[in-house]
UniProtKB/Swiss-Prot annotation:
UniProt keyword annotations, A-Z: Cell cycle, Cytoplasm, GTP-binding, Hydrolase, Nonsense-mediated mRNA decay, Nucleotide-binding, Protein biosynthesis
InterPro entries xref list: EFTu-like_2, G_TR_CS, GTP-eEF1A_C, P-loop_NTPase, PAM2_motif, T_Tr_GTP-bd_dom, TRAFAC_GTPase_members, Transl_B-barrel_sf
Region (Disordered): 1-44, 71-124, 146-191
EC number: 3.6.5.-
An MF annotation (GO) of this entry: GTPase activity
Sites where the protein binds GTP: 213-218, 349-352, 391-393
Family: Belongs to the TRAFAC class translation factor GTPase superfamily. Classic translation factor GTPase family. ERF3 subfamily.
The keyword Nucleotide-binding appears for this protein: yes
Domain tr-type G: 201-425
Region G1: start-end pairs: 210-217
Signal sequence, renumbered to the chain: none
Name used for this protein in its record: Eukaryotic peptide chain release factor GTP-binding subunit ERF3B
Gene3D superfamilies: P-loop containing nucleotide triphosphate hydrolases, Translation factors
């Protein structure tokens, strides 16, 4: 008893000190500071000195206790740690939210059975050491398997993970904490460093497009849940919050609409990003805004996409509003084609709505109206387009075949994505990474999708059009650290040699030996989609090309092109009007990066917009050198 009391003077201040103690010794005072131990020593010794073995019996219940108790009150339950309550505090930290003792302690490597210390309590000091060591080793953070710890963090309602200092926290806080733990788990799994030689799944960017309120974000959230990227408790939390705001049917979309303004109004503004995986592929969801005010944001999302999902609402009245003139269904489909999207999946959503009730007649009606328009835009109905019915809210036909539509015999949405043929990308091509965004974080970080070539850590690159030499310090592919990346991956690259202020969206990272072209004047072929009046030389618009947005002027009209024969007119036209195709010369306000459509299609297609409308789409034919 005396030796135990005297040893309490050297109570460690942190768990690292406990780690360094000799395994065989009976440690004391590892949970409270030496000052507190000094104050408590006398009352403890007088209260418990001759009653150790009697009070040792409740040891097992105390290990499983789910509430915090001050260390000096728990002393009787753990005799060997009397004077300063060392063992009791160890159990206190563990007991707060870990009924099986899953917490702190990294002590002696002894591994007796749970019953053994109870039998030998009345014995000598060796029994004391065994009793103390048993929970320490079983629960030691060093020995504990990662899977085991996460399994228990999900099963057991935890108090505070940091140290168990508030065991009396109420259920709402506990559930919120658990959700944070769940999210943390997902993040941790993504921060693993992938070796450069590891086989990678093909990366595919999927952009969800369509009229406002068609259900794009809801389907995205449903996919996240069905593929395990968002856990059930997080969704239940979103559902509770959505009900409080009288937005019950919006809760799934909150998995992608993280911005408070987006949640309050139910409108996506930015392009939401999320990831999910199937057996063969790694997908990034780009949830584009459907509202006409945010079409420029949608173009930015579509320019990074390999595959577009056009979401249509089958609800009576909603389909007509979205598809008729003024709706965004038409414009989005056209912009997706212009942005270079090859495959289009048309999801006829809200089939569970009472006005539809999984009616094959309504499904076919929507399909019949859409096909002629999509054909006109440039999609081939047989090769490029696939229609399927679904319900984003209930998840029917998203991952598994639905009983509600026995008339649909094709694959559900997620299996269909997994079975798509591979996208042929050139790993040996020139490095082209259009910049989408940039920010400061221990250096300059740029975001973008690698269109061509491959990048490795430590590589020397050039930022065009300013010709800045930069070095790659680190690479994150969808938030996973890696040393090497291939085309199609969404990257965050930390650069050395350039300031964040010197970069603009639309700049391109290139190989020093193969720079991309840049300039201000170029010849193009354009199709006038929608414009009430005629367009003459001197007309100004906004150019969207890859991730770049720039003011542009039509300086000259060179010739008209016959839509059927492709023949060019011999005389220069004085103007062009809606539905005509022409060759024109454009000049931008500033220098931009671009390539001809023939050499590099992703950087040779563009859209012209004016007064909130897409007025023309086109492709770059020739770059005109600047006159000195």
């Amino acid at each position: 008893m005396d030796s135990g009391s005297s040893s309490s003077d050297s109570a460690p201040d942190c768990w690292d000190q406990v780690d360094m103690e000799a395994p065989g010794s009976a440690p004391s005072g590892d949970g409270v500071s030496s000052a507190v131990a000094e104050a408590q020593r006398e009352p403890l010794s007088s209260a418990f000195s001759r009653q150790l073995n009697v009070n040792a019996k409740p040891f097992v219940p105390n290990v499983h206790a789910a509430e915090f108790v001050p260390s000096f009150l728990r002393g009787p339950s753990q005799p060997p740690t009397l004077p300063a309550g060392s063992g009791s505090n160890d159990e206190t930290c563990t007991g707060a939210g870990y009924p099986q003792g899953k917490r702190m302690g990294r002590g002696a490597p002894v591994e007796p059975s749970r019953e053994e210390p109870l039998v030998s309590l009345e014995g000598s000091n060796s029994a004391v050491t065994m009793e103390l060591s048993e929970p320490v080793v079983e629960n030691g953070e060093v020995e504990m398997a990662l899977e085991e710890s996460w399994e228990h963090s999900k099963e057991v309602s935890e108090a505070e993970p940091g140290g168990g200092s508030s065991g009396d926290s109420g259920p709402p806080e506990e559930s919120g904490q658990e959700m944070m733990e769940e999210k943390e788990e997902i993040r941790k799994s993504k921060s693993v460093i992938v070796p450069s030689g590891a086989p990678k799944k093909e990366h595919v960017n999927v952009v969800f497009i369509g009229h406002v309120d068609a259900g794009k974000s809801t389907i995205g959230g449903q996919i996240m849940f069905l593929t395990g990227m968002v856990d059930k408790r997080t969704l239940e939390k979103y559902e509770r919050e959505a009900k409080e705001k009288n937005r019950e049917t919006w809760y799934l979309s909150w998995a992608l609409d993280t911005n408070q303004e987006e949640r309050d109004k139910g409108k996506t503004v930015e392009v939401g990003r999320a990831y999910f995986e199937t057996e063969r592929k790694h997908f990034t969801i780009l949830d584009a805004p459907g509202h006409k005010s945010f079409v420029p944001n949608m173009i930015g999302g579509a320019s990074q996409a390999d595959l577009a999902v056009l979401v249509i609402s089958a609800r009576k009245g909603e389909f007509e509003t979205g598809f008729e003139k003024g709706g965004q269904t038409r414009e989005h489909a056209m912009l997706a084609k212009t942005a270079g999207v090859k495959h289009l999946i048309v999801l006829i959503n809200k089939m569970d709505d009472p006005t539809v009730n999984w009616s094959i007649e309504r499904y076919e009606e929507c399909k019949e109206k859409l096909v002629p328009f999509l054909k006109k835009v440039g999609f081939s109905p047989k090769k490029d387009i696939h229609f399927m019915p679904c319900s984003g809210l209930t998840g029917a036909n998203v991952k598994e075949q639905s009983d509600f539509c026995p008339w649909y015999t094709g694959l559900p949405f997620i299996p269909y994505l997994d079975n798509l043929p591979n996208f042929n990308r050139s790993i040996d091509g020139p490095i082209r990474l259009p910049i989408v965004d940039k920010y400061k974080d221990m250096g300059t970080v740029v975001l973008g999708k690698l269109e061509s070539g491959s990048i490795f850590k430590g590589q020397q690159l050039v930022m065009m059009p300013n010709k800045h030499n930069v070095e790659v310090l680190g690479i994150l592919s969808d938030d996973t650290e890696t040393d090497f990346v291939a085309p199609g991956e969404n990257l965050k690259i930390r650069l050395k040699g350039i300031e964040e202020e010197e970069i603009l969206p639309g700049f391109i990272l290139c190989d020093p030996s193969n720079l991309c072209h840049s300039g201000r004047t170029f010849d193009v072929q354009i199709v006038i989609i929608e414009h009430k009046s005629i367009i003459c030389p001197g007309y100004n618009a906004v150019l969207h090309i890859h991730t770049c947005i720039e003011e542009v002027e039509i300086t000259a009209l060179i010739s008209l092109v016959d839509k059927k024969s492709g023949e060019k007119s011999k005389t220069r036209p004085r103007f062009v009007k809606q539905d005509q195709v022409c060759i024109a010369r454009l000049r931008t306000a500033g220098t931009i990066c671009l390539e001809t459509f023939k050499d590099f299609p992703q950087m040779g297609r563009f859209t012209l917009r004016d007064e909130g409308k897409t007025i023309a789409i086109g492709k770059v034919l020739k770059l005109v050198p600047e006159k000195d």
